[in-house]
Amino acid sequence: MILGFIGTGKISSSIIFGIFKSKLKIKRIYISSRNRNLAKKLSKSYGKIKILNNNQEIIDKSSVILLGVTPNVGNKILPKLRFSKNKKIISLISTINLNKLKKITKNNNIVRAIPLPPIEIKKGPIIVCPPE
C-alpha cells in the first residue's frame, strides 16, 4: 500500500507514527512539505517516508490519499487538484462534508475519519463515516 498525506500536522503525524508502530504493510508514504520541520522529522524517523513539494504528485503516486489540512486550506487547494476515480480518499477535514468532497474531487471513493492523537500509540477510537 502506498499512502499520501496532504497536510503534515498533528493528526497526520500521529497516524503516521501509529502506522509504523503497527504491523501494517506499507510500501511507501508520501507527505507534503507544508510543515517543513515536522515533515523532516518524519522522513528522518522512517525510511519509507518521502517528502514531496507538490500535492498533485502526492495524489498521482499514492493509492490512498489522506487529506489532513484545515477546512480553509482544503477549500482553497482541493479544487485545483485532480483525483482519479480509482484513488481511495480519507478525509480528516472536520467541516467539509462528504457531498462537497465528492463534488470537489469528482471521486465517490471517499470516507471521513476523525482520529484522535492517541492513535500515535495505537490507542483511542477512530470515527469513520462511510460514503453512504
Predicted regions and their residues:
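Short loop segments at secondary-structure junctions
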Residues: 130-132
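Rossmann-like NAD(P)(H) cofactor-binding subdomain of soluble oxidoreductases
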Residues: 36-38, 46-49, 55-60, 64-128
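NAD(P)+-binding Rossmann beta1-loop-alpha1 motif at the extreme N-terminus of oxidoreductases
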Residues: 1-57, 123
